[in-house]
């Protein structure tokens, strides 16, 4: 089984989520029991909603648990260098438009593009891995191929924990 990189903070966030989800289980089971006692299950919206919630809850618990043993937990504070690797914050410039973007490369289970972090397994992440300042990459995007130049590579240590 292939390991999955994740920051210490990302791992802790998933541990907290798993703990919270497991604490929700009894309440969902109780909601199902109470809805079942209301009678006819074919037209019982409360029962259907509780069963749906249980399904989503169990699916997320199973997903997280299946990933936990495969994680390669990496302390971002120990990273550095001149090459793009997991944990690097990379500034890239669109060669054609001059638009500049900044991304931190993280694992697929903690990447949040809206907050500036992308998965190292995303098309941009894969194109950046192993590159240096001044290198150019080409990314296939819906609007066509985009050429970027790597402007800077930095390592900032632990990322700020997102509010849970």
UniProtKB/Swiss-Prot annotation:
Role this protein plays: Necessary for efficient RNA polymerase transcription elongation past template-encoded arresting sites. The arresting sites in DNA have the property of trapping a certain fraction of elongating RNA polymerases that pass through, resulting in locked ternary complexes. Cleavage of the nascent transcript by cleavage factors such as GreA or GreB allows the resumption of elongation from the new 3'terminus. GreA releases sequences of 2 to 3 nucleotides.
What are the leading ranks of the lineage? Bacteria, Pseudomonadati, Thermodesulfobacteriota, Desulfovibrionia, Desulfovibrionales
**A Pfam family the protein falls into:** GreA_GreB
Kindly state which keywords UniProt assigns to this record, in alphabetical order: Coiled coil, DNA-binding, Transcription, Transcription regulation
Q: Which residues form a coiled coil?
A: 12-38
Q: Name one GO biological process term.
A: DNA-templated transcription elongation
- Please tell me whether the keyword Transcription regulation is annotated for this protein: yes
Stretch forming the signal peptide: none
Tell me the InterPro entries matching this sequence: GreA/GreB_C_sf (IPR036953), TF_GreA/GreB_CS (IPR018151), Tscrpt_elong_fac_GreA (IPR006359), Tscrpt_elong_fac_GreA/B (IPR028624), Tscrpt_elong_fac_GreA/B_C (IPR001437), Tscrpt_elong_fac_GreA/B_fam (IPR023459), Tscrpt_elong_fac_GreA/B_N (IPR022691), Tscrpt_elong_fac_GreA/B_N_sf (IPR036805)
SUPFAM superfamilies in alphabetical order: FKBP-like, GreA transcript cleavage protein, N-terminal domain
Could you say which protein family the record assigns here? Belongs to the GreA/GreB family.
Which PANTHER family does UniProt cross-reference here?
TRANSCRIPTION ELONGATION FACTOR GREA
Q: What is this protein called?
A: Transcription elongation factor GreA
């Amino acid at each position: 089984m292939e390991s999955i990189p994740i920051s210490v903070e990302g791992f802790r966030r998933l541990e907290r989520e798993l703990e919270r989800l497991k604490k929700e289980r009894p309440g969902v089971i109780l909601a199902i029991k109470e809805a079942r006692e209301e009678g006819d299950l074919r037209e019982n919206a409360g029962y259907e909603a509780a069963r749906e919630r249980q399904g989503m809850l169990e699916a997320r618990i199973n997903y997280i648990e299946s990933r936990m043993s495969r994680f390669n937990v990496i302390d971002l504070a120990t990273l550095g260098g001149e090459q793009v690797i997991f944990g690097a914050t990379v500034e890239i410039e669109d060669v054609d438009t001059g638009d500049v973007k900044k991304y931190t490369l993280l694992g697929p289970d903690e990447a949040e593009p809206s907050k500036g972090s992308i998965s190292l397994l995303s098309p941009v992440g894969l194109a950046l891995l192993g590159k240096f300042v001044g290198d150019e990459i080409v990314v296939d995007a819906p609007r066509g191929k985009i050429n970027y130049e790597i402007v800077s590579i930095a390592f900032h240590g632990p990322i700020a924990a997102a509010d849970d």
